[in-house]
């Protein structure tokens, strides 16, 4: 069974997310644990957490298919001490929110070194992750591959491996693969050889069991453009045929697919339908 969903709004409460996920044709989801554009975050009440867990059970959503995504302001690679410290403290709070809700996975962008260099940036990320992981429990941090722009760290999977290898609690660090970001950074998933190379790289660097989520996004720009502009499924440069190649791999089918395509719930429902149309159109076998 394909595990698919989208990044869902929490404006009406965490407990609305499971129902809204089912309404768009999904069985998986990603949410922000708080207002993503704020340094402020608070734990949900006991009542809110209980209602959320009840709705998860009611709608049959597996906890392995539920994810949080860290806020936009966090930058563990920042050379600015105040931003780095605020990022660490907010990430700790996000981990606590995930634990309260029962969500096991928290996705983060590693961060931007802001021109100070990859090595220094990775050192700061590792120090930040150690501070977070050594003072929290349970939640697994997912390092997401990012676009090659603005001093970003993580546009190559080797950079994510460097980070994971250096943290104290490697068992609490896994990865997310974003199809737009990867395409933007030169990973061509529109060809069978490209997907095979990607899977081989993930296996050799992390082990495929460490790939916990796929951010399923088309790209507004061509391969290697380094623009980081998501597009709706089938409407960008990856396209229907490209996604058909990607979807045909069993290793890809085993991982939850989360849409971060333009639009809201209505558009995401259409994109989920498009995914299954591609699977049917190209005769892709699905377990």
From Swiss-Prot:
Superkingdom field: Bacteria
Record-listed Zn(2+) 2 binding positions: 144, 178, 215, 260
Q: Which reaction does it catalyse?
A: Endonucleolytic cleavage to 5'-phosphooligonucleotide end-products
Locate the residues binding Zn(2+) 3. Answer: 181, 228, 230
**PANTHER family, from UniProt?**
APURINIC-APYRIMIDINIC ENDONUCLEASE, ENDONUCLEASE IV ENDODEOXYRIBONUCLEASE IV
Q: Which residues bind Zn(2+) 1?
A: 69, 109, 144
Q: Does the keyword Nucleotide-binding apply?
A: no
The cofactor named in the record is:
Zn(2+)
For this entry, the protein name equals Probable endonuclease 4
A Pfam family of the record is AP_endonuc_2
Q: What class of enzyme is it?
A: hydrolase
Q: Give its E.C. classification number.
A: 3.1.21.2
* UniProt KW keywords: DNA damage, DNA repair, Endonuclease, Hydrolase, Metal-binding, Nuclease, Zinc
What does this protein do, in the record's words? Answer: Endonuclease IV plays a role in DNA repair. It cleaves phosphodiester bonds at apurinic or apyrimidinic (AP) sites, generating a 3'-hydroxyl group and a 5'-terminal sugar phosphate.
Q: Which InterPro entries match?
A: AP_endonuc_2, AP_endonuc_F2_Zn_BS, Xyl_isomerase-like_sf, Xyl_isomerase-like_TIM-brl
Point out the gene that encodes the protein: nfo
Q: Which GO terms describe its biological process?
A: base-excision repair
Task: Tell me which family the UniProt entry assigns to this protein.
Answer: Belongs to the AP endonuclease 2 family.
Q: One MF term in GO for this entry?
A: zinc ion binding
Q: Which organism is it from?
A: Thermotoga maritima (strain ATCC 43589 / DSM 3109 / JCM 10099 / NBRC 100826 / MSB8)
Cofactor binding notes: Binds 3 Zn(2+) ions.
């Amino acid at each position: 069974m394909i595990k698919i969903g989208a990044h869902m709004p929490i404006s009406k409460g965490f407990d609305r997310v499971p129902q809204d996920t089912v309404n768009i044709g999904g069985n998986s989801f990603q949410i922000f644990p708080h207002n993503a554009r704020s340094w402020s975050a608070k734990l949900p009440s006991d009542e809110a957490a209980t209602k959320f867990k009840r709705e998860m059970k009611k709608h049959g959503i597996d906890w392995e298919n539920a994810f949080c995504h860290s806020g936009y302001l966090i930058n563990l690679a920042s050379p600015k001490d105040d931003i780095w410290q605020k990022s660490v403290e907010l990430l700790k709070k996000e981990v606590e929110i995930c634990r309260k809700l029962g969500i096991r996975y928290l996705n983060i962008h590693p961060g931007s070194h802001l021109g100070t260099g990859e090595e220094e940036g990775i050192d700061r990320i590792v120090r930040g992750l150690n501070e977070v992981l050594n003072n929290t429990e349970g939640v697994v941090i997912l390092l997401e591959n990012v676009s090659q722009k603005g001093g970003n760290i993580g546009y190559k999977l080797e950079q994510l491996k460097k980070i994971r290898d250096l943290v104290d609690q490697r068992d609490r660090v896994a990865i997310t693969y974003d199809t737009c970001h990867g395409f933007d950074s030169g990973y061509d998933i529109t060809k069978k050889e490209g997907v095979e190379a990607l899977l081989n790289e993930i296996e050799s660097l992390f082990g495929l069991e460490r790939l916990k989520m796929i951010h399923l996004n088309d790209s507004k720009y061509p391969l290697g453009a380094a623009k980081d502009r998501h597009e709706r499924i089938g409407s960008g440069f990856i396209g229907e045929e490209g996604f058909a190649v990607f979807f045909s791999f069993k290793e890809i089918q085993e991982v939850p697919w989360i849409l971060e395509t333009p639009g809201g719930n209505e558009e995401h429902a259409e994109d989920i339908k498009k995914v299954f149309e591609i699977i049917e159109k190209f005769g892709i076998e699905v377990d």
